[in-house]
């Protein structure tokens, strides 16, 4: 299966809601060419894993609320998610519907991703997929990045592969107390993040010093790192505004 650009890693019930979902790894050929050529990773590609609700395309899933199967209770479902559903997620969904991606056993998937950098959850929360999938497919991958907003309720073993996505100082403190490394989004204009956290080196504010595949900070506990990470809210302007509205509403309701 090494000649395929993408494979289905998982097809089954969501670990969040029980509804059908599919997890698809894309960009394998590009990542493999980069690995063989020894190209500077700053200019290269990571394998992208999309976690999509089954039965309808991502745009309609969001409109109907069916995206809860892959996004859970993430606050960014309310209009502040930086992901453009009509772009990557919809394109992958349509390709999947055309039969472009073959289903791979976990053993085949592990071999296909061996030596490659993987971005876990380009869209969708990794907690929606059984942890054994990540445990198996990442066994030989070069590196990975991963984030989950479901850190309170998911399989806590996921902390080995993922950062806890946090949107407030309180969430950050709670996630750390539960044993997670944290990735905290802060409002636009914030000059600093939580204590013991570094500014994301791939962010605009840091001068885009490193690409994620070079930095490797956001790999949960897998790499033995202890630092936490923060980043100012990003994406198109109206989504940044929506994020700050949601955070303000959340604080007022506490």
Question: Residues of each region from the PLM?
Answer:
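Class I S-adenosyl-L-methionine
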Residues: 1-253
